[in-house]
Amino acid sequence: MTKDMTTGAITPLLVKFTIPLVLGNLFQLTYNAADSIIVGKFVGEDALAAVGTSNPLMTLAILFINGMCLGAGILVSTAFGAGNAQLMERQVSTTAIAGTVFSLAFSALCVILATPLLQLMQVPADILPIAVSYLRIVFAGLIFTFFYNFLAATMRALGDSKSALYFLMISSVLNIGGDLFFVQVLNWGSNGCALSTVVSEALCCVLCVLYIRWKVPILQLGRRWLVFDGKLLRKTVSYGWASAMQQATVQLGKIAVQAIVNTMGVNAMAAFTAASRIDDFAYTPQQNIGHAMTTLMAQNRGAGKHDRVKQGFHCGMRIEAAYGVLIAVACFAGAPFIMKLFVTDPEVVHLGVRFLRTVSLFYLMPAATNGIQGFFRGIGDLKVTLVSSTFNMVFRAAAAAVFVLVWKMEIEALPYSYAVGWVVMLLYELPMLVRYLRSHGEEL
């Protein structure tokens, strides 16, 4: 099933396309959070801290792969909007072949480097073996991460954001069930959670492939799946690399912040782990709205409908702002209840609530930055998104280091450092947006 986004009312199109993206990511975050909840409840704080300190590296690898798929998806979406089926097919097959080779090599490298990378993050020696074991299992399954993200990004580029949601819902349920089985029944600890995550992703890939074979004629390429276009690969890499580096830069900033958190003690580490998972639930839909804007704008750019590109930006920004206000209120008010879903230790809960209530005050800023990034991705200018994300994370990590290591602030230092990064990001993005629009004879 595909969806042409070059016709029809824009706001309903964006909302209908965004909802499955949001739900899909919420389910994905749910089964990631299930690891933390189950480990925290049934294994202990040391294991929770180990899983939490492994999460930034794990997410870095996943986001790098996802960024490559997202960049390739922009090209697929543009070709689809232009009605060039042959170009679209070559784009899909070339990405599949190159991505398979890359993800296998990347997986092997990550498994080998797991220990030194965690040591570089100053992970305490008493939880290092737990973290290494957990991380290596997840890294071994990166091939499944690639295939799911590639197939999902391709279907989204064709206007279908619902199918990937259905597969992810099934996978999430299986993952949570697997977590409980491996941890409670087999007593495999955090390793059981990692294994459950890999198995769930593998099943998600199988479901995607079966669905495409049965229901998506435009992707039933047969032997054309083996077509490899070296010239097209170079363009794919230029888009994918910029997108991947943008995603990776964001996560590198989080890793730097995690290294600073690791100096604050196990309670702060556990609180930050739980609160960060909750923060992901709040923040990820803002990214999804931006991604929906990207698909709509890329299709209309391919079709030469520039007025709809501008209209899509305005509609998307209004949706971003409404969500930012809603989630800020919900997160501030519900922080104590939500934290208790993850941990029972009163001190850890207290620290997590302080983090969440502070960061919720700033949620309108990432709403704006994600909308602007969605615009620039949609018009094919990924340099702006890469540079702005780099500024964000460099200033975030620097601010966290000053607040915690120099000024000796407590856990509130972390959300304040987030705010610093978002402000710098906006100071770069807004002038770039105004300059682009004026150069094309338009206004905001």
Describe the residue ranges of each PLM region.
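Interfacial/gating helices of multi-pass transporter permease domains
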Residues: 39-59, 125-130, 190-193, 232-239, ...
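Small-residue-rich hydrophobic transmembrane alpha-helices
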Residues: 48-108, 145-164, 271-335, 366-380, ...
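Hydrophobic transmembrane alpha-helices of multi-pass small-molecule transporters
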Residues: 60-63, 175-179, 204-209, 281-284, ...
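Short runs within selected transmembrane alpha-helices of multi-pass transporters and secretion channels
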Residues: 69, 137-156, 164-172, 193-208, ...
